[in-house]
Curated annotation (Swiss-Prot):
Class in the EC hierarchy, top level: transferase
Statement: the UniProt record of this protein carries the keyword Transferase: yes
Keywords (A to Z) from UniProt: Cell cycle, Cell division, Cell shape, Cell wall biogenesis/degradation, Cytoplasm, Peptidoglycan synthesis, Pyruvate, Transferase
Known pathway: Cell wall biogenesis; peptidoglycan biosynthesis
Name of the protein in its database record: UDP-N-acetylglucosamine 1-carboxyvinyltransferase
Entry's EC annotation: 2.5.1.7
Modified residues (2-(S-cysteinyl)pyruvic acid O-phosphothioketal): 117
Record localization: Cytoplasm
Organism: Chlorobium phaeobacteroides (strain DSM 266 / SMG 266 / 2430)
Length: 424
């Protein structure tokens, strides 16, 4: 296994380009299954373990792919299988994204129950409910979701999600674009990743109204075409890099971003005392002499993102006072707190709320990643900790951050990647 060895106490400053979004790449890649002919050319796809796993899943289905220099080419003409096996699906929850496209194109699908990050309940019930609304018959047996449609054609329907779900909205969208008739999705997720998926599907020939809102109306079409498309930036990676500069007292300029998609996060950085300036495609952050305590509540977009709460907790260990962090999306997403406390942080969990007491002098030690964003919080803490911090199980980090140690080293960090053996 790999670990990151971080020599703390170095200021993160400089200019860096944001990577393409993982969370928009995955549904876009899944949506290529909807086209029967042609080759897709997808630009700005990040080199990540999750992308590799997902392309392996598509290859298992019969899809042809090539990936070079962040450009993925996909041909879905020769799909041979509608079975997504456990060996691949267990590695990531986003594998469920193939359910909607397979059902829409072939009228059947068999997908293993998914894996992925291990924090709290993340049910797939909403995905299945949406497919059933569109006319699919769903069975769960022997660890698989088996779905089929009479007549092989989904039918338009009204899908009202009881809670906002990015994954379920994406799956419903991909299923509905080839369904017969009109589908209305209410309480749809409005995250930029869903907006990007809508743009992608529309460019393929789908008929979607309400892009960027919580109500989507889809008029099914007969066929969709392969296209060339450029992915959007990764707003969570961008916010994490801003936090790296802020926690170390540095300054940073991020290029290739859309500041409007970072509005909630940038507002909190300002409350924490940072200076923020934006251009049409860049953001600059200048740290204060002393960070100010700033409460956040993670909720669906456009609010503060749940995928940044772990990093914000790490940042607030250096703020001058008490900060309260609440996650309304995943109430139990606090696996990183014991590891941050091992570094010298003083963080308590009270009533599903993290109470961060700062500022605290952190000292390097060995810590273990438990999920993707938790690992990012440990890297941030290691950047400011005195001495050497070793972050184990960084395969979690590699699922969602493209060459993160190289980016941080280019900004002034001293991080090396080393092999280690984990004892059972």
């Amino acid at each position: 296994m790999d670990k990151l060895v971080i020599h703390g106490g170095r200021r993160i400053s400089g200019t860096v380009a944001a990577s393409g979004s993982k969370n928009s790449s995955l549904p876009i890649i899944a949506a290529t299954l909807l086209a029967e002919k042609g080759t897709f050319t997808l630009h700005r796809i990040p080199e990540l373990h999750d992308i590799e796993t997902f392309t392996q899943l598509l290859q298992h289905l019969g899809v042809e792919t090539t990936f070079n220099n962040n450009t993925l080419r996909v041909s879905t003409e020769n799909v041979q299988s509608i079975l997504a096996p456990y060996e691949l699906v267990k590695k990531m929850r986003a594998s469920i994204y193939v359910l909607g496209p397979l059902l829409a194109r072939f009228g059947e699908a068999k997908v293993s129950l998914p894996g992925g990050c291990a924090f709290g309940p993340r049910p797939i019930d909403l995905h299945l409910m949406a497919m059933e609304k569109l006319g699919a018959e769903i069975k769960i047996e022997t660890g698989f979701i088996t779905a089929s449609v009479k007549g092989k054609k989904l039918r338009g329907a009204h899908i009202d999600f009881p809670v906002s779900s990015v994954g379920a909205t994406g799956n419903a969208l991909m299923a509905a674009v080839l369904a017969k008739g009109t589908t209305t999705i209410t309480n749809a997720a409005a995250e930029p990743e869903i907006e990007t998926l809508c743009h992608f599907l529309s460019a393929m020939g789908a008929c979607i109204d309400g892009t960027g809102t919580t109500k989507l109306v889809i008029e099914g079409v007969a066929t969709l075409q392969a296209i060339e498309f450029t992915n959007v930036f990764d707003r969570i990676e961008a916010a994490t890099l801003l936090a790296a500069a802020a926690i170390t007292g540095g300054s940073i300029t991020l290029n290739g971003v859309e500041p409007s998609q970072l509005k909630a996060v940038l507002k909190k950085f300002v409350h924490a005392g940072c200076q923020i300036s934006t251009q049409s495609d860049s953001v600059t952050l200048i740290s204060p002499e002393q960070l100010l305590p700033t409460d956040v509540t993670a909720k669906p977009y456009p609010s503060f993102p749940t995928d940044m709460q772990a990093q914000w907790i790490a940042l607030m260990t250096q703020a001058s006072g008490k900060s309260l962090i609440t996650d309304r999306v995943y109430h139990e997403r606090f696996n990183h707190i014991p590891e941050l406390n091992r570094l010298g942080a003083h963080i308590e969990i009270k009533n599903n709320q993290a109470v961060v007491h700062g500022p605290r002098k952190l000292s390097g030690t060995t810590v273990m990643s438990t999920d993707l964003r938790a690992s990012a919080s440990l890297v941030l803490a290691g950047l400011v900790a005195e001495g050497i911090t070793e972050v184990l199980r960084v395969y979690h980090l590699d699922r969602g951050y493209e060459k993160i140690e190289m980016k941080l080293n280019a900004l002034g960090a001293q991080i090396s990647r080393e092999k280690y053996k984990e004892f059972s």
